[in-house]
Design a protein with these regions (language model features):
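Long, highly charged amphipathic alpha-helices
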Residues: 14-21, 70, 74-78
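N-terminal targeting leaders
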Residues: 16-17, 28, 58, 68
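Short secondary-structure junctions
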Residues: 23-35, 82-88
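A short amphipathic beta-strand at an alpha->beta junction
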Residues: 76-102
Length: 102
């Protein structure tokens, strides 16, 4: 794997911090939420950022869907606090059954 530049390391640290905070909140507030993982392409940051909340079952996922917009807003607010503006918050956070390896 190619070594990350200083800018890419900062971007990764920023996203990891936000993802960890949101994951901790979500585990407390959303039953059935297993983990939070993310994917992004550094050369397209922040537009390529995709944060995923993984759920243990279809029932837990369906029960959590009404909360999706609230969590998208939380992600957007957390990124703004870090100095990153997400133009369309709905594109950057999804609820899924898939894990990072799927």
């Amino acid at each position: 794997m190619k070594k990350l530049s200083k800018v890419q390391e900062k971007q990764q640290a920023l996203v990891l911090d936000v993802a960890d905070r949101l994951e901790a909140q979500a585990r407390e507030e959303i039953p059935g939420m297993l983990q939070c993982w993310f994917d992004m392409e550094f050369h397209l940051f922040p537009s390529s950022l995709l944060l995923c909340f993984q759920f243990e079952s279809e029932q837990a996922l369906e029960a959590a869907k009404p909360e999706l917009l609230k969590w998208q807003k939380r992600l957007s607010a957390a990124m703004v606090k870090k100095g990153v503006i997400l133009k369309d918050m709905r594109k950057h956070l999804v609820f899924t059954l898939n894990g990072p390896e799927d």
